[in-house]
Amino acid sequence: MPVFFLYFSQRLSLSQVLRLEAIYYLCIVLVEVPSGYFSDRYGRRLTLLIASAALFVAYVIFFFGDNFGEFAVAQAFLAVGLAFNSGTDTSLHYDSLASLGRESEFGDREAIVARNSMLAGGLAAVIGGAVAVFELRYAYLLSAGMALVTLMVVLKIAEPESHKKTLLPEKPATQLKICLGLLRHPLLAWIFAFYVLITVLNHIPYEFYQPYLAMVLQKGTSLASGTPLSTGIHFGAAMFIASFFAAFSSRLCQRIGLKRLLLSLVAFQTLTILAMGLTLNFLIVVLVLFRTVPRALMTAPMNAAIAPLVGSSQRATFLSIQSLAGRLAFAGFLAGLSLVASESGQAQWSPLSTQLLISAGFGITGLFALSLFGKGK
């Protein structure tokens, strides 16, 4: 959704916008892990049905909403929708291949999934940005329509046979203990730490490129009606670029190694954030076009490394725990950044620059720690 920051900023102060984002991530805390257990216990199909329905409700509320309270409710439904999808989509993919005895194809197929997902996301961003030139809320109407289409598609999905045999996982407390115990595996623990760090770093350019782009194009003046199209095209271009890299992510990982690949992605994203924080320049806008490349290159190799190490009856729960840790880390980080945000409705360069430089410092520290943690393992 390339217009959410602009849409909220029309009606709320920057600090309120950041708090709305924090509310979303904190709501994830309530449903992320239970949604993973629900998927392991009741099946992938039902979980995805709930996810699609919740997203539809969220976008409808966004479309009709006009104040902080209504947007907060919509954020809660959005959290439910994305949490119930998180981990279950990957688990459904692996379980489906396992049912066919084709698990070895998972990594390469995940790369194709990532590529296609980003191509679709890029197209949606351009269309949403164009529609939002006339009215920002129309982008949410289109999103509601697509959520409804997704719901119809999920109704046609069958539960994988391999997962039907494991639909009775341990009791919730025991399941949680088993999943956390999996972190004794050195590779799973390292990937878990990487995921928490990169979740924070990947979201920083995504959250702040809209006001940054507006300042570059308009030298800090108020957001004009052309900005949604500009941000939509920019977001779409970023997704199209990322889709190119996603297509060969599995092969790149095989060539240079998983840890080396993932560490290089942390370094790249940190440098991007640092550049954004140092200056307002159109060349940085071009650099930020590559901000989604780390997610494109990490998704398939990371999932391919995790899936065989975690059993089907724990896989969605484990992935949900990992996702929760990353989202919770970003929620706390975002709440902290809101303390140095402007209280006015218009984003200003000085506090924005400070937020970005703080984020870059966090990335440098995390990269150093992750490099040390990964040595010899």
Language model features: what each stretch is:
Residues L30, S230-C253:
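Transmembrane alpha-helices of Major Facilitator/SLC transporters
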Residues A53-N67, A267-L280:
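C-terminal ends and interior cores of transmembrane alpha-helices
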Residues A130-G145, T221-L229, A341-T365:
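A membrane-interface helix-boundary motif in multi-pass transporters
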